[in-house]
């Protein structure tokens, strides 16, 4: 395996070279990091599958990665993409505020306003659309347009809906309990925390 040090001198040099050609993502963050990771996977052409998961998971268990990979690496299955989900309850309270209070009601409102569509049905079918855990078969990577901000999870789902049949897409229950570092609400600053996440 390879570790990409996104703030290290080698990747910073590559980033500058790509920026000079207007090819590099211009926003720092998860989307940019994923863009470089997937780019390296495509360039090396050695991995059959790639999985991504958030790095701030407090309840991490290595079985999560195995569960995430299994549907896309098992040759018996025809899945190109797997999205993880898990309960968003920890310390006797409901988490997943952006998914619960913005994304789910927004999808319902859109459906009531513009009517049902394959896209809205697809997005509503995911138990936790903002999960940062997903895996792909390698051939999927060159088809993806990657968002460089907090919108990466919704963007990846949109790309999968655009490029693949629902029969090639699955969801997997990753954990009985899941907790991660929570973002501040940031009511007074839309460039941070949940405010930025919701806008993106």
Task: Label each residue range with its predicted role.
Residues 144-148:
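Conserved nucleotide-sugar donor-binding catalytic segment
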Residues 44-58:
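Short beta-strand-to-loop acidic/aromatic patch adjacent to the donor-nucleotide binding site
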